[in-house]
Amino acid sequence: MPENTDLSHEEYERAANYWKEKDAQSKKLDQDALKKTVEEYIQANNTCALATAAGDFVRCTPLEYTYHDDCFWIFSEGGEKFYALEKNKNVCLVIFDKYEGFGKLKGMQVTGLASIVEPFSQEYVQAADFRKIPLKALEKMPHPMNLIKIKPKKIEFVNSDFKKDGADSRQTLICD
């Protein structure tokens, strides 16, 4: 069996910059049309993988979400992701379809900032209502459910259907 070899710094840089260089030359969709398609895909799904990290600690957790008011909302009892969230609010979440071939790719990577919403605040109650979680059920819990709010900064969406519109399959939406 061959030994694992590491890449040089230059090789890591080249690999890391691959999509930046390719995207600079790509055919882009109109940002309004892209935003509409991105939001349709987000709303058509409800499960993501949320990656959190701080120092050498990394965690990636499958979670259910809702999306409204241009943010992702995730209720969570707890878990190790909170070790990282205490120290680093930068997160990445991904939503993707089952792989069925290159002509049928759909998935997105969302880079954003997480915050923890105060339990039973107006924002918390609204998110519970949107998710159809009865407030009385939340109030009866021995410990309040945590609510993670993620404000996207950038959404990178790979969708093979974009080629039908004359654009490249990988598009980036910069969020404000």
Where are these regions (language model features)?
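Short, basic/aromatic recognition patches
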Residues: 27-47
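Short beta-strand segments
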Residues: 45-78, 93-97, 106
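Structural motif
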Residues: 71-72, 90, 113, 154
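Helix-adjacent hinge/juxtasegments
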Residues: 81-115
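Short Pro/Gly-enriched beta-strand edge/turn motifs at strand-loop
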Residues: 43-49, 129-132
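Serine-centered coil/turn micro-motif
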Residues: 79-80, 121
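Charged, amphipathic alpha-helical segments
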Residues: 31-35, 78, 132-133
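Charged, gly/pro-rich active-site loop segments
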Residues: 1-29, 105-176
